[in-house]
Amino acid sequence: MSEKFDYDLIIIGSGAAGMSAARAAAASKIRVAIIENELVGSKSDIYRVAQLSASDIANQYYEAKKFLQLSNNQDTLTYNYPSLFETIQKRVKKYILAKKKSFANFKIDLIHGDAHFISPYEVAVANKRYSAKRFLVCTGRSMDLGAISGIETTNYYLPEDIFMRVKKLPKIVLVVGAGKKGIETAEYLAKMGCKVIVTEKEDTILEGYDKEAIEVVTNKLVSGLKIKILTNTKVVAIQKDKNETVSSGRRVATVKVTMKRGADEKTVRVEAIVFAINNRPNVELGLENAGIKFSDQGIVVNDQLETSVSHIFAAGDVVANPIKQSVGYSTEKAAYEGTLAVNNILKRNKLTLTYRHFSTVLNTTPKSVTVGLTEKDCLSRGIKCKIVIVPEIETTHSLIASEKLGFLKLICDKDKKLLGATIVAKNADLAVMEIVAGMYGDLTLLEHASMPHINESFSDIVRIAAKNLM
C-alpha cells in the first residue's frame, strides 16, 4: 500500500469487531492503528467480563443459600460486597491488561480519543490528523434514554454501572427494559438479595426470543426469584425524592418513578433505577464528511461489509444490517464481521456474510442459547419448517439434575436440513456446540441421531430431538 498515508488501515473502535480485525490485519504485515475513546476492549467487551464475573459470584451465593435450605441448616449466609466488588475489578483489569499486551504483540498503534472524519481518507483525533488507505468503523452502540422527564436531574444507573462501579448494592431496584441486558441485570440483583421490579414497554420480555424460552425464564424470575415484571409499561418520569423508610426497612434517598400502562398511571419509590433500553448506533463521527451513508439504524453496508465509500468498511453493532437474526447480536458475530471485513479490505477472495452458525446466549439460570434461525425468523422469511421440542425431563440426565426446567427446540427445513435451535438449560452454552458443529459441517439428522452420546449427559437431548425429527 502507498507510503503517502500514515497507515494502511485505521480501525475506529476496539470492541470485538475492532480487535479481531486488528489481529487479522496485523498478521498480514500492514501498518495498523486503532482509535479508541474508552478503555481498550470497548465498553461492551469489558461489560461482558464484569457481568459474567458478577453473575458467577451471584450464582455461588445463591446456590450456597439453597444448599443450606436443602440441609435444613438454620444459619444465615451473608456476604462482604466490597470484597466481591474488588474480585470483579481484578478480573476486568486482567482482561484490559491482556488486550493491551495483544496490541504490543501485533505491533498495533493505539490512539486514544474520539475520531472524526475530515475527508474520505483522513480523521482527526483531538488536534492531530491521521490518514489511511482504508478505514474500518467498529464504534458499536450506546444507550439512548429518549425523552424521560427528570432524567437530567436524577441519578440513575446503566447495567455496566451495577457490575463495574456500584460498591454497595441498593435493596430495592427498578430495572427499565427486559431485553438481554435488563434481564441479566435483574437476575443478578435478585440473587444478591435485592428486591427487583422490571418494566418493559412491549407485551413480552426478551422480544425476539422463542416463546418457550421466554416462558421458562419468566417462570424462574417470577416464581423462583420473586422479581415483579410489568409488561406494556413505560417509564415516563423520574424524580429525586425525599429520604424515607422504604420496604427494606432502611431510611434512604429514594427515586420516585412514574409509569404508564395504557391510560393507567402508577408511581413507585425505589432506591435505584437501572436503564437497559434503546441502544443506538454510534455514528457521530463525521461520516457525512467521508460520504458514508447511514441512518438511525446504523451504517449502511453490503453483504461484504463495504459502505457506500469503497475503501471504508464497517463491522459490529454500528452496522445497519438486515441479515441479523431476531435474537440480536453477540460478541462472536461482531468478531466474525471484523475478520471478514479485513479479508475483503485486503482484496482477498471476497467473502459474504452468513450468520447461520452463530449463537446468542442469555446468561441467566437456566441459560437460553439460540443458534441459527428461530421459529419467528422462519415465519418472517416464509420458510416452511419442521419443529420438535424435547423437554429435559425426557433425558436420563434429568434423573440426577436438581432442576429439570430445560428443553431443546430443533428446527429443520422440508429437506431435513438443520436451520436452528434453542436450548434452555444450565449448561446450554456447552450443549449447543454439537448443533453448531453439525450445522457448520452440514451433518444430517441421521448423523446426529446415530452419533454416540453420553447417556447421562444433557447433550443426549440432541440425539433424541434429531431422532424425533427424522
Located regions from the model:
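Glycine-rich flavin
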Residues: 2-7, 23-169, 202-206, 211-213, ...
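Flexible, glycine-rich terminal cap/loop adjacent to redox cofactors
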Residues: 10-59, 363-374, 379-470
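Short glycine-/small-residue-rich Rossmann-like dinucleotide-binding loops
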Residues: 15, 36, 140-141, 261, ...
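Beta1/beta-strand and adjacent pyrophosphate-binding region of the FAD-binding site
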Residues: 3-17, 169-179
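A conserved FAD-binding loop/helix module that cradles the flavin
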Residues: 213, 315-377, 455-470
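Glycine-rich dinucleotide-binding loop and its adjacent helix/turn
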Residues: 139-195, 199-201, 229, 288-290, ...
